Amino acid sequence: MRHKHGYRKLGRTSSHRAALLKNLTIALVNSGKIETTLPKAKELRGYVERLITRARLGDFNAHRAVFASLQDKNATNKLVTEIAPKFKDRNGGYTRIIKTRIRRGDAAEMAFIEFVA
């Protein structure tokens, strides 16, 4: 039974899962919109929203906290200085998931995840 189980394992070890979420976040920050599988998009949503909430403060500690998660200077800078200030007056719900198609090779549900404008 999976009662009260708080996250998706995505068929990966914990370190692989952390690296996957970090890389998907960097791709989302750089491009603004990515296509991935639906479970990955749903798991990524919570990860990104916590980062944006932290980045909204915009101070030095916010930069450090975001960089600790992403380990990418360009993505960190873009998230804290460009993306997070757009959501200054918004309490959560910074991303949108749109179901797109069924992938032909393995019939996986695909979805776009993007920032709300």
Swiss-Prot record:
Entries under InterPro entries matching the protein: Ribosomal_bL17, Ribosomal_bL17_CS, Ribosomal_bL17_sf
UniProt family annotation: Belongs to the bacterial ribosomal protein bL17 family.
Keyword Ribonucleoprotein: yes
GO MF terms held by the record: structural constituent of ribosome
One GO-annotated biological process of the protein: translation
Protein name: Large ribosomal subunit protein bL17
GO CC terms, sorted: cytosolic large ribosomal subunit
Residue stretches spanning the membrane: none
Entry keywords, A to Z: Ribonucleoprotein, Ribosomal protein
Oligomer status and interactors: Part of the 50S ribosomal subunit. Contacts protein L32.
Organism: Campylobacter jejuni subsp. jejuni serotype O:2 (strain ATCC 700819 / NCTC 11168)
A UniProt-annotated Pfam family: Ribosomal_L17
